[in-house]
Regions:
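N-terminal Rossmann-like NAD(P)+-binding domain of SDR-like oxidoreductases, especially those catalyzing
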Residues: 1-179
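Substrate-binding strand-loop-helix patch
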Residues: 95, 182-189
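Short, intrinsically disordered, charge-balanced linker/junction segments flanking boundaries
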Residues: 192-195
């Protein structure tokens, strides 16, 4: 078994690399190292079990080449951090939605099951606790740049579910909530590692 992890040199992705290796799965990592770090993979690097491709998920040629070599895909690559989202909203939207579109098309082409990571931000301003995936969502004004991230991730979910609906591409969506832990950096505006 071999898995592709986009964003596999990032904070969450590097932990997934370790877990899959522990379960006997070989791993291909695709990461542009814009927020991921090579150091996150140094201690697990083994040419027979882990391969790192330094490139972007926005390149269909690269993504297709990676996807056809694996049995399943974990799509974690994304714009990261409040600072980037506020300072570069165009880059945020284009990289999130564009990258996910490229990954989903490649997975559909080669019939590879895919897990798409989303965010708790897609719940928006909902007042109901606990959150429910079936609840209606209330987002902030489009003039508030912070909502571009939540809306882009929601569009990722719509794209993934559309691929399931149209072609029965096996898709799982995981909404991550405020992840923290070793190897996380405060460099991109994350609060906990800053303290």
């Amino acid at each position: 078994m071999r898995a592709l992890i986009t964003g596999g040199a990032g904070f969450v992705g590097s932990w997934l690399v370790r877990e899959l290796l522990a379960r006997g799965t070989d791993v291909l990592v695709l990461d542009d190292l814009s927020t991921g770090r090579y150091e996150n993979l140094e201690e697990v690097e083994d040419g027979r079990r882990v391969e790192l491709v330094v490139d972007t998920v926005n390149d269909p040629g690269i993504v297709n080449e990676c996807v056809k070599q694996v049995d399943l895909v974990f799509h974690l690559a994304s714009a990261v951090g409040v600072r980037l989202i506020i300072d570069q909203p165009v880059r945020t939207i284009e990289s999130i939605v564009g990258g996910t579109d490229v990954v989903l098309r490649a997975c559909a082409r080669y019939r590879r099951p895919v897990l798409i990571t989303s965010t708790s931000e897609v719940y928006g301003k909902g007042s109901r606790i606990p959150f429910s995936e079936g609840d209606d969502r209330i987002m902030g004004a489009t003039t508030k740049r912070r909502w571009s991230y939540a809306c882009a991730k929601a569009l990722d979910e719509f794209l993934a579910l559309a691929h399931w609906y149209e072609s029965r591409l096996p898709v799982v969506i995981a909404r991550l909530f405020n992840t923290v832990g070793p190897r996380q950096t405060g460099q991109y505006g994350m609060v906990v590692p800053t303290f």
